[in-house]
Amino acid sequence: MPSPTTVPVATAGRLAEPYIDPAAQVHAIASIIGDVRIAAGVRVAAGVSIRADEGAPFQVGKESILQEGAVIHGLEYGRVLGDDQADYSVWIGQRVAITHKALIHGPAYLGDDCFVGFRSTVFNARVGAGSVIMMHALVQDVEIPPGRYVPSGAIITTQQQADRLPEVRPEDREFARHIIGSPPVIVRSTPAATADFHSTPTPSPLRPSSSEATTVSAYNGQGRLSSEVITQVRSLLNQGYRIGTEHADKRRFRTSSWQPCAPIQSTNERQVLSELENCLSEHEGEYVRLLGIDTNTRSRVFEALIQRPDGSVPESLGSQPVAVASGGGRQSSYASVSGNLSAEVVNKVRNLLAQGYRIGTEHADKRRFRTSSWQSCAPIQSSNERQVLAELENCLSEHEGEYVRLLGIDTASRSRVFEALIQDPQGPVGSAKAAAAPVSSATPSSHSYTSNGSSSSDVAGQVRGLLAQGYRISAEVADKRRFQTSSWQSLPALSGQSEATVLPALESILQEHKGKYVRLIGIDPAARRRVAELLIQKP
């Protein structure tokens, strides 16, 4: 380690070496490359990546915390002015907390006493001292005034949004302090670092503004509610929404037949969390999901599973929201519950784009729908979520009174990976139908049959769910040429209403049509329409 009084600089053809103060704690498997200057009292946990390999220095101020999985990178061009009036790619002030999986990408400035929540991103932005950025937020191309609060899921990309952010409250600081905790680290400079994984906890960098303990410490530490659930509840309440819950046993969960729990009338955070705890206890051994409810429009703005029968909860709530308001309680145009797109469609589009797929649409009038003669809509070239959702809204408006289905497209293989009906002229598309329509997932074999002919759990579960809702099962086949033009050939509907009868019949179809595409069809016999399409075999 270099002398504490000097900072190494890059020589010809060689990156500068990081400077780490002897009083800093850096985990042995953290990755620190380039001209990174880490001050005294800084704690860098396992899996942190700090890479200053583009020629400009990074500064991490005293007593800051970087939790597991945090990433700090920079660009070759673009600088920020640090508190010492020098140019940096990334400046992180004193007592800053950067939590798990957060990304700070330079040029970026974080003032003293800032907090950045799980999986949030700060890029090309200045964040004023004392600001709190909650979970899964994006802050880009803006300057946030000191002491502002960025709610979970917010997308702050215009200065107008940044200027309207609310001020941080004492309970926000207390919650941030509670989340930071005291993660153990391994000090590189300690000879026994590789053997000793324990360190003495030190005070957290963010102090509560009130001596009174808050709801967070009472519930997150001892109850069933995770910190992400508590954060989401607080965010929803701050935006004026009500909190609700639903529960389902394993049988009802498979068919998405949720039952409402006792309504939560209170808007007091402490009382709401207490009632949520009671709900989880009352329905132990069942699935429970959290709801955010807009009482003005009488619609849901958020859904997330918060309990499973085995007592576990999802690692992250990030992929489950129905629609999350961003900024100062305002919803983005594409996620608005008053728009044409349902919450589940918005979520599915987000997931498909995250996997690198393109989005497409097809439409059909009632006559063409009966013969599955879909017509392609104008292609959506963008991969930006906001633009894609806006174009989907336009497509639904343009083809009002027709059937419209959403497509997920793998541009590399020029094949579809997802199909779902998102507009039905005869009424709203139910959540079960939207959820039951995937063609395939990111793993091509996840919705196929195994080599010995037995069905995968995904396909068997799909069949079970459709039969449980009273739907009939059919199949369609296509060779490679017909598949490219979506010219499927229908097979006779499968007789039988039991899983034991239908699954063997499907296996026979797959054997008979080896070397062809085969897709499963769920049919509503009462309405004489399709409710699900699922690709179960590829050549």
UniProtKB/Swiss-Prot annotation:
Disulfide bonds: 261-279, 377-395
RbcS-like repeat 3, SSUL repeats: 453-539
Result of knocking out the encoding gene: Single gene deletion does not form normal carboxysomes, and does not grow in normal air but in 2% CO(2), called a high-CO(2) requiring phenotype, HCR. CcmK2 and RuBisCO are targeted to an abnormal large polar body in some studies, RuBisCO is soluble in others. When ccmL-ccmM-ccmN-ccmO are deleted no carboxysomes form, cells are HCR and RuBisCO is soluble.
Induction and repression of expression: Carboxysome size and components vary with growth conditions. When grown in ambient air at medium light (50 uE meter(-2) second(-1)) there are 719 units (both forms are included in this measure) of this protein per carboxysome, the numbers decrease under low light and high CO(2), and increase under high light (at protein level).
Compositional bias of kind Low complexity: 431-457
Superkingdom classification of source: Bacteria
The record's account of how the chain is modified after translation: Identified as 2 proteins of 58 and 38 kDa by mass spectrometry, called M58 and M35, the shorter protein is translated starting at Val-216. Protease inhibitors do not alter the appearance of M35. In isolated carboxysomes M35 is 4-5 fold more abundant. The first amino acid (equivalent to Val-216) is not seen in Edman degradation, while Tyr-219 and Gln-222 may be post-translationally modified.
Keyword Disulfide bond: yes
Use of this protein: Heterologous expression of 12 carboxysomal genes in E.coli (ccaA, ccmK2, ccmK3, ccmK4, ccmL, ccmM, ccmN, ccmO, ccmP, rbcL, rbcS, rbcX) leads to the formation of bodies that resemble carboxysomes, have densely packed paracrystalline arrays and RuBisCO activity. These structures open the door to generating carboxysomes in plant cells to increase their photosynthesis and productivity, as well as tailoring bacterial microcompartments to specific metabolic needs and molecule delivery.
SUPFAM superfamilies, alphabetized: RuBisCO, small subunit, Trimeric LpxA-like enzymes
Classification via Pfam families: RuBisCO_small
Region named Disordered: 194-213, 427-459
Primary localization: other
Annotated keywords: Bacterial microcompartment, Carbon dioxide fixation, Carboxysome, Disulfide bond, Photosynthesis, Repeat
GO cellular component: carboxysome
GO biological process: carbon fixation; photosynthesis
RbcS-like repeat 1, SSUL repeats: 226-397
Residues in RbcS-like repeat 2, SSUL repeats: 341-425
Domain comment in the entry: In the N-terminus has a gamma-class carbonic anhydrase-like domain (CA), while the C-terminus has 3 repeats that are similar to the small subunit of RuBisCO (rbcS), called SSUL. The SSUL are connected by flexible linkers. The N-terminal domain forms a scaffold on which CA and maybe other carboxysomal proteins assemble, while the C-terminus binds RuBisCO. At least 2 SSUL domains are required for initiation of carboxysome assembly. Isolated reduced and oxidized CcmM35 binds holo-RuBisCO (RbcL(8)-RbcS(8)) but neither subunit octamer alone; RuBisCO has a higher affinity for reduced M35.
Miscellaneous comment as given in the Swiss-Prot or TrEMBL entry: The M35 form (short form) is translated from the internal start codon Val-216 (gtg), under control of an internal Shine-Dalgarno sequence. Silent mutation of the codon for Val-216 to a non-start codon (i.e. gtg to gtc) leads to low level expression of the M35 form, and abnormal carboxysomes which contain the expected proteins, but does not grow in normal air.
Purpose: Functions as a scaffold protein for the assembly of beta-carboxysomes, initiates carboxysome assembly by coalescing RuBisCO (ribulose bisphosphate carboxylase, rbcL-rbcS). Produced as a full-length (M58) and a shorter form (M35); both forms are required for correct carboxysome assembly and growth. The short form is more abundant. Despite its strong similarity to gamma-class carbonic anhydrase (CA) it does not have detectable CA activity. Beta-carboxysome assembly initiates when soluble RuBisCO is condensed into a liquid matrix in a pre-carboxysome by the RbcS-like domains of probably both CcmM58 and CcmM35. CcmN interacts with the N-terminus of CcmM58, and then recruits the CcmK2 major shell protein plus other less abundant CcmK proteins via CcmN's encapsulation peptide. Shell formation requires CcmK proteins and CcmO. CcmL caps the otherwise elongated carboxysome. Once fully encapsulated carboxysomes are formed, they migrate within the cell probably via interactions with the cytoskeleton.
The protein's name in its UniProt record: Carboxysome assembly protein CcmM
Gene name tied to this protein: ccmM
